[in-house]
Amino acid sequence: MGTLCSVCKRRPNPVDTEGKVINVTDDFEEMSETEIMLACPQDKKLCKKPKESMYKTKHKSNKHGI
């Protein structure tokens, strides 16, 4: 599970294919919902973030229940 969340916190980047983790913790709050979905298109449902992060990044998702 932890690795899925790591993927969600990375921007889509060719460097990721080499296994390098790009730390964008500061930028993550500013990422749009679209960018987050691009960062992890398959794992977005499996990647459960703390509710604090969900409110900051994906306001609409809270209506679906976590």
UniProtKB/Swiss-Prot annotation:
InterPro entries in the record: Herpesvirus_CEP3 (IPR024360)
Cell location: Virion tegument; Virion membrane; Host cell membrane; Host Golgi apparatus membrane
Broad class of where this protein is predominantly found: virion
Lipid-conjugated positions (N-myristoyl glycine): 2
Listed GO biological process terms: viral budding from Golgi membrane
Modifications after synthesis and translation: Phosphorylated. Phosphorylation does not seem to be required for recycling to the host Golgi apparatus. Packaging is selective for underphosphorylated forms.
Keywords: Host cell membrane, Host Golgi apparatus, Host membrane, Lipoprotein, Membrane, Myristate, Palmitate, Phosphoprotein, Virion, Virion tegument
Entry-linked Pfam families: Herpesvir_UL11
GO cellular component, as recorded: host cell Golgi membrane; host cell plasma membrane; membrane; viral tegument; virion membrane
Superkingdom to which the source organism belongs: Viruses
Protein's membrane topology: Lipid-anchor
Family designation: Belongs to the herpesviridae cytoplasmic envelopment protein 3 family.
Assembly and binders: Interacts with cytoplasmic envelopment protein 2; this interaction is essential for the proper localization of each protein to the assembly complex and thus for the production of infectious virus.
HAMAP family registered for this protein in UniProt: HSV_CEP3_gammahv
Known role: Plays an important role in the cytoplasmic envelopment of tegument proteins and capsids during the assembly and egress processes. Also participates in viral entry at the fusion step probably by regulating the core fusion machinery.
Protein name per UniProt: Cytoplasmic envelopment protein 3
Originating gene: 38
